[in-house]
Amino acid sequence: MTLTAKQMGMKDTTFKNAHGLTSAKHISTPKDMAILARRLIYDFPEYYNLFGRNSVNVLGRTLYNTNRKFLSQYNGSDGIKTGFTSSAGFNLAASAKRGNKRIIGVVFGSSSVSLRNKRMTELLNIGFANSKENVAFTSLKKLSLYPNIINILGENSLLKVSKEPVKRPLI
């Protein structure tokens, strides 16, 4: 998994297990998770719809999506993945699409689900308000709301990236 991650450009990620629970040196960054999210959306569109479902029935049992609250609260939200461990906190990689714009955001280390969802809402709102269609990946600017975050504007997307490679345990 780590080799594949590196090949995708996830330079600061090391996978130590497939389930994502805390393990020594099992780490990633918001930037790397955004790269993974983008690859998931665009490289595997036939599977991406699975991440936007509120629930699924498997063998007569209903399994609920862990990000269904965010999906139902944010206009255009269509995925992707939540996570939590004691060491990593509450995390979310999310994507939303409005018209021709798709914004991907990643929040690591929140102290609660509600704070995580609030931060993600703020990030996606900033993305939709500030991104332009067909802009090359060259424009960097600081966000005063999150001084340790930069944004990279790109064609139909806004990638939120930590200025420093803050590594956190994966969940």
Segment roles from a protein language model:
Residues 1-11:
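Beta-lactam-recognizing serine transpeptidase/beta-lactamase-like catalytic domain environment
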Residues 10, 14, 22-27, 31-171:
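Domain-terminus/edge residues, biased toward the C-terminal soluble/receptor-binding domains
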